[in-house]
């Protein structure tokens, strides 16, 4: 308990210092957000966050606590239910509590989190009665503590809050789920993730993150997240794994692309699609860009990732893959077997495409350069159908799902400019997919290569986490230490 109080005191001092420092804000943060941030930082420990359950009938609620016991109190139509939380030990001596709210129906609910002397604010959310599902896609949020900018967290959390609010305002029927393509936190620190939870919408709309390479720089993500249907991979990242979520007609496959052990990813995709055979839309969400281009120094890595991942998407009929990492916005052609199946240049509507569309979005906070070191526009990927260079402005993408159409619209935050639109229609559940089964020898080669790469990655993470003083026994079996 003493360690817990000391840790929270240090974190509180850090956040307050970052929020009231004398350095001028690089971003014009209004007084309303500065006041909200000051109030939020006074009660830093909980970081209440709503994550998705298996489907719309569930919500996963998580928060930090000095107590290992707690519950969520849910109210609707005058009736109150309590959902007991389970506790996970956090290395700093605190706990991350998680409660699963079940049996939700179309209605408006209010909930509060309780643990020890802590009682959260009351948060209200709605379960939609319509069949239409609207998902918000963003990536590379990059909450960050910066040595050169003591106001970084307040500025970045404000920009993130504005991005969420802009998306909600532009969503005709509200937002059902927030999909994030990784790199939520620049250093993977708990303080950064606490800032991530500061927007009100992080407590009222389910947040579905994926693991990014920056999230792996420390272990905050491992304890911050509370997610359903997690894959038990033989080779997995220390901080997370694959999981799936089903909303309406859409199945979201949330992949940890930092983990290149493809045998586990194939096993996960097979189980998830089998459990959701009636889903019309299969959407993959991962971190690493494969087709956008713009960063020539990543060509070798992207080629390897395409060899590893695209056969899986072909085999399981993935309609769209959402990713980030490059911080550049791009949309590919319809791709099958790593080749263009349908050229999407100047097309905004397609029916029954036999392949996958890959969409990479820009960063919420870390904007990619418009020109390279030689003053040239960075080259796009050869299979990219549309690209957009953002001038230090966050983007977001809304995906609307019905039983026969997926409509994609991407916008700028500041002026809500619609930079890209695409509608994919299906005449039946399978559309044009042929579900190519990878040849056994190619799959064996892929498994072999992916395991070697994964061992190298795990070795790097093993050394990083060991230096930080964390328990690395999991890795010792994976790298033969």
Where are the model-predicted features located?
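Active-site environment of divalent metal-dependent phosphoester hydrolases
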Residues: 143-147, 185-191, 213-219, 260-263, ...
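Active-site neighborhood of phospho(di)ester-bond hydrolases with catalytic His/Asp-centered motifs
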Residues: 137-139, 177-183, 187, 207-213, ...
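Acidic, histidine-bearing metal-coordination/catalytic regions of metal-dependent phosphoesterases
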Residues: 24-148, 392, 402-481
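Extended active-site neighborhood of metal-dependent phosphoesterases/phosphodiesterases
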Residues: 99-100, 108-127, 191-278, 282, ...
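Core catalytic region of metal-dependent phosphoesterases/phosphodiesterases
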Residues: 156-218, 315
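Acidic/histidine-rich helix-loop elements
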Residues: 85-88, 95-96, 136-162, 218, ...
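An acidic-aromatic substrate-binding cleft motif
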Residues: 118-181, 187
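Active-site-proximal segments of metal-dependent phosphoesterases and phosphodiesterases across multiple
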Residues: 152, 158, 279-321, 333
């Amino acid at each position: 308990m003493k360690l817990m109080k000391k840790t929270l005191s240090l974190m509180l001092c850090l956040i307050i210092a970052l929020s009231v420092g004398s350095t001028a804000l690089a971003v014009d943060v209004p007084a309303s957000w500065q006041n909200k941030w000051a109030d939020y930082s006074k009660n830093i420990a909980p970081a209440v966050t709503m994550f998705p359950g298996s489907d719309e009938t569930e919500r996963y609620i998580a928060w930090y606590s000095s107590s290992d016991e707690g519950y969520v109190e849910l109210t609707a139509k005058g009736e109150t239910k309590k959902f007991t939380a389970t506790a996970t030990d956090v290395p700093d001596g605190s706990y991350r509590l998680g409660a699963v709210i079940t049996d939700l129906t179309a209605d408006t609910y209010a909930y509060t989190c309780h643990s020890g002397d802590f009682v959260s604010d009351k948060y209200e959310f709605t379960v939609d009665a319509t069949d239409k599902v609207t998902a918000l896609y963003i990536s590379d949020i990059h909450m960050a503590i910066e040595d050169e900018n003591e106001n970084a967290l307040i500025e970045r959390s404000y920009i993130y809050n504005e991005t969420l609010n802009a998306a909600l305002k532009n969503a005709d029927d509200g937002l059902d789920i927030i999909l994030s393509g990784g790199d939520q936190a620049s250093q993977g620190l708990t303080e950064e993730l606490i800032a991530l939870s500061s927007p009100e919408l992080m407590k009222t709309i389910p947040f579905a993150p994926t693991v990014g390479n920056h999230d792996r720089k420390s272990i905050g993500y491992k304890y911050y997240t509370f997610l359903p249907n997690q894959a038990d991979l033989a080779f997995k990242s220390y901080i997370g794994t694959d999981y799936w979520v089903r909303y309406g007609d859409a199945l979201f496959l949330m992949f940890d692309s930092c983990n290149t052990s493809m045998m586990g990813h194939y096993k996960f995709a097979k189980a998830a699609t089998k459990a959701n055979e009636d889903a019309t839309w299969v959407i993959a969400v991962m971190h690493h860009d494969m087709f956008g281009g713009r960063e020539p120094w990543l060509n070798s890595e992207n080629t390897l990732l395409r060899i590893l991942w695209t056969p899986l998407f072909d085999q399981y009929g993935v309609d769209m893959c959402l990713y980030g990492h490059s911080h550049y916005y791009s949309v590919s052609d319809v791709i099958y077997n790593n080749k263009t199946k349908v050229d999407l240049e100047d097309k905004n509507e397609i029916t029954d495409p036999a392949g996958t569309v890959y969409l990479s979005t820009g960063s919420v906070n870390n904007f990619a350069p418009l020109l390279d070191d030689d003053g040239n526009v960075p080259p796009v990927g050869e299979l990219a159908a549309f690209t957009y260079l953002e001038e230090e402005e966050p983007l977001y993408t809304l995906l609307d799902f019905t039983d026969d159409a997926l409509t994609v619209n991407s916008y700028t935050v500041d002026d809500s400019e619609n930079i890209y639109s695409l509608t994919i229609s299906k005449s039946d559940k399978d559309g044009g997919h042929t579900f190519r089964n990878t040849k056994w020898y190619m799959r064996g080669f892929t498994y072999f290569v992916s395991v070697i790469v994964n061992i190298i990655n795990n070795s790097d993470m093993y050394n990083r986490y060991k230096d930080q003083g964390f328990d690395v026994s999991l890795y010792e079996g994976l790298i033969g230490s």
